[in-house]
A protein has these predicted regions:
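N-terminal signal peptide c-region/cleavage motif recognized by signal peptidases
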Residues: 17-18
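A short beta-strand-turn-helix
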Residues: 28-52
């Protein structure tokens, strides 16, 4: 019984410490997208609403390449914690948003710098290519 209690305590310590340090990918609804990224219903010209550059992953739950991209984005979220934000938009749940951006292929990534126009990349890209895009498009290094 004593060992069981120790395991429980250790489990919760690990669980909470992982949550404190991990920068998670955030899932967005259409309404959240409008306030955090761009309100396409009110503005015709692109105006990024965020203070930190972001990547938006337009995906679906059944898409094989989307599933392979997800852990890469999680890793990048941790590597660039505080420098960029990574959002995910489920195109089947947020059809209006996907249609507004002309998303016809998944995964599609939208790279949004704080200043300037966003850039789109389609398909499953290697981590190194994504890192290069983050450095050049979002962080302007």
């Amino acid at each position: 019984m004593k060992h069981f209690k120790l395991y429980i305590v250790a489990f919760f310590c690990i669980l909470f410490s992982a949550e404190i340090y991990a920068e998670d990918v955030t899932y967005l609804t259409t309404e959240q997208f409008k306030t955090r990224v761009f309100d396409y219903t009110k503005n015709k010209q692109w105006k990024y609403e965020g203070e930190t550059p972001c990547i938006i992953d337009f995906y679906t739950t059944w898409c094989g390449p989307c599933k392979r991209l997800s852990p890469i984005l999680e890793e990048l979220s941790e590597e660039y914690c505080g420098e960029i934000v990574i959002y995910k938009v489920d195109t089947e749940r947020e059809r209006e948003l996907a249609a507004a951006f002309g998303i016809t292929s998944i995964p599609t990534l939208l790279f949004c710098p704080v200043e300037g126009r966003p850039q789109i990349a389609k398909g499953l890209l290697p981590k190194e290519v994504l890192k290069q895009a983050i450095e050049e498009v979002l962080l302007k290094k």
